[in-house]
Amino acid sequence: MVEQDPFEIAVKQLERAAQHMKISEEALEFLKRPQRIVEVTIPVEMDDGSVKVFTGFRVQYNWARGPTKGGIRWHPEETLSTVKALAAWMTWKTAVMDLPYGGGKGGIIVDPKKLSDREKERLARGYIRAVYDIISPYEDIPAPDVYTNPQIMAWMMDEYETIARRKTPAFGIITGKPLSIGGSLGRNEATARGASYTIREAAKVLGWDGLKGKTIAIQGYGNAGYYLAKIMSEDYGMKVVAVSDSKGGIYNPDGLNADEVLKWKREHGSVKDFPGATNISNEELLELDVDVLAPAAIEEVITKKNADNIKAKIVAEVANGPVTPEADEILFEKGILQIPDFLCNAGGVTVSYFEWVQNITGYYWTLEEVRERLDKKMTKAFYDVYNTAKEKNIHMRDAAYVVAVQRVYQAMLDRGWVKH
C-alpha cells in the first residue's frame, strides 16, 4: 500500500536532485508546480437511460521542452495528487530520454470494470470534449495508461477529429492507437524491449561476459513482465527462474517458458501452480539469489524492511516507483546497480514518440527500424545517467534526475522563464 502522498514524494525527489546540481531557487520553485491543472466534469448517459457524472483531470506539468505527453488513467481511486506526481515523472522521463516533449498526465475517477463497452465509449468521447481546448498534436498528446487501451484511444482520436473537422495529422493527437489508424509497430513490447537494452548495458558496465545463462526473476506478469520474460530468454539466452502476479509466484531453477506461463495464467487466472515449478510468494521472489531482479508490478515493493535481503546484482525497475528512497540508499551501499524506473521503463513513451513522428510525417517504419531506433535512444540515455552517477558518486536514480532536471532547467533558461 502506498503510504505517502505521491506528489510530496515527487517534490522530495526533485529537491534531492537539486542538491547535486547548480539550479536557481526560482527555477526550483517553478519546477515544484505544474504549469496547468484542469479538472473537468463529464456527464455520461448510462445504458439504463440514467446519467452519471464523472470527474476527470489533465495535468500539464512542464512544457519548456515541447508539447506535454502522458497517459490517461481510469481508476476508482484516482486522485489529483497522483496525476500531478505522474505528470512530474513524465517530465523527467521525456527529458532523460531527450525527447522533444514536456510531461503530462490525465485521469478519470471511475471503475471501468463496472462499465459496458458503450458506456466506456461515451465516457472516452466525453473526456475529449471536456479537454479539447488544451490538447493537440502540438500542445498535449495523451496515450493509454491504467485501464485504458488502444480501443479507448481510437474513440478519443475519432472524437477529436470530429470536433476539429480535420484528419491527419490529427492522427498524432493520441498515441497507443490500433495499427489500423496510425499506431506504431513495436508498441506492445516497447516497455520491455527498452528495459532489455538497459539490462544489456548494465551487464556490460559490470564486466559480465553477456547475459547468456544468467538468471532473472520478474515480479509482475502483465504486458511488461511477459514481454520481458520472452525477450530476455529468447533474445539474450537468460534463464527466467521466477515470475509472479498479484496472487503469488512460481520458481524453477532450470528456467520457465514465457509463452507457456502466459497460456497457464490466461487459463487459470494466475501463474501459480504452473507444472514443474514451485509456488513462492512475491516477497520470496524479490529475495531470490539471481543475477537480475525486475520489479514489474506495483510501487514500493523494495523498502528498508527487505532491501538488505536483495541478492540480485542488477535491479531493473520496470514498474513505476518499486523502490523507496530509504531502500535506494541500502542498495547503493550494497553495490547493487539500479536502473531507475523512468529510465528503465521509458521504452513505452519513446515508441509513443516514434508513433507521433510517423503520424506527423505520414511515413511508417518497419519493426526492425523501430527496435533499432529504440536501442539507440535507450543506450544513450543509459550512459548519460551512468556516467553522471560515476562522475558525481551518486546512485543511478539521483543521476537520472540530475540529467533530466538539467535539461528542463536549460530549456527554461533559454526561454527566459527563469534566471541563473
Swiss-Prot record:
Transmembrane segments: none annotated. Its EC number is 1.4.1.3. It comes from the Archaea. Pfam families: ELFV_dehydrog, ELFV_dehydrog_N. Its main location: cytoplasm. Keywords: Cytoplasm, NAD, NADP, Oxidoreductase. NAD(+) binds at G220, Y221, G222, N223, A224, G225, Y226. Coiled coil: none annotated. SMART domains: ELFV_dehydrog. It is found in: Cytoplasm. GO terms for biological process: glutamate catabolic process. The active site is at K105. Belongs to the Glu/Leu/Phe/Val dehydrogenases family. Homohexamer. This is Glutamate dehydrogenase. It comes from Pyrococcus horikoshii. The lineage of its organism: Archaea, Methanobacteriati, Methanobacteriota, Thermococci, Thermococcales.
